[in-house]
Amino acid sequence: MSIVCSPRWKLIGVAGLFLFSPCVVAQKAKPAKFKVALSGRADFHTIQEAVDHAPATGAIIRIAPGTYHEKISIRSAHVILVGAGDRPADTIITWGDSAKNTGSTFKSGTITVFGAGFEAENLSIANTWWDDHPSQADRSQAVALQLEGDKAVLDRVRIVSGQDTLFANSGACHGDLSSPCAADRQFFHDCFVEGHVDYIFGEAKAVFDHCELHSRRHGNVMITAQSRHSPLEDSGFYMLHCSITGANDGSKVVLGRPWRDNATVYFYDTDVEQDIDPAGWSEWGDRLATSTYREYKSHGPGANLGNRIVKSPDLELGEEAKFSTARLLAGEDAWNPEREVKVLRTLAGSR
């Protein structure tokens, strides 16, 4: 509830008396609540139907355990998807498109989000193109989640594909490239992301906190491909306290390559369980010199910092404090995505 005051005085009646007041009480609208299940009692039997019925105030969509074969588009703001199972693998949203059969990487996503304030909890999102088309001739980009919008939060979400698994993007900085610009903010907490070529890519300002980045077998594996349209925008990928896993099967694994000039990626306090190529990073179109690639406090059997082609300067006294979600994503509105995670876990625990 909030108090809204008008510049004009308004005549109101209270207990039979008439008073003049400049203020009225406004009730904050609540999001709709829907239940989705494959069968039985539910508001809807597909997730897309529930999304399509979301009002402007948003919707909390609880999804019963099961495998939902759907390609989902979310354009409304404040849509929250919550898996109602005991673990993320109990509720799976899956599809199998690619750039090859749709004509574009950006049409291949299993879930595509353009609404601000999107949240997801305790579920799995998969693109099965690479599993369904194992031949080399069919290799193609196949997005599982395309996410574009400010203040997105994902907690305990599994995102699985091959090439271009997670498109963590921002549409905020495509206009005037001569002025500073704040990119869309996204927070991934306790998530699992699997893929091989550029499997986390895009232009968002995204923090990955305590996530597992799992590399699939492939000749060349690039974990990230970050992008900026301008050196004045603040986008970047920040991997905080994450782990890098995958079989040591001969794949050449690097932390990332620059999709465009001024790519920005930080790995901080990473448990490197998989062997990483000693170079650490790879070139793409002579953009490496413009990029900001940093790696601090990596540890584990695959952490070998001696021969990195991009050297990380020593942290100055007190500089480590910037590697926190609160510092990185607060913005001008003091956003606190960690508080949203607590709310999401409460929603997942309710029945």
Language-model segment annotations:
Residues 5, 22-23:
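Short, low-complexity, intrinsically disordered N-terminal modules
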Residues 13-22:
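Bacterial N-terminal signal peptides
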Residues 2-12:
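Bacterial N-terminal signal peptides that target proteins for export
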Residues 29-351:
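Sequence-level preference for short, compositionally simple segments enriched
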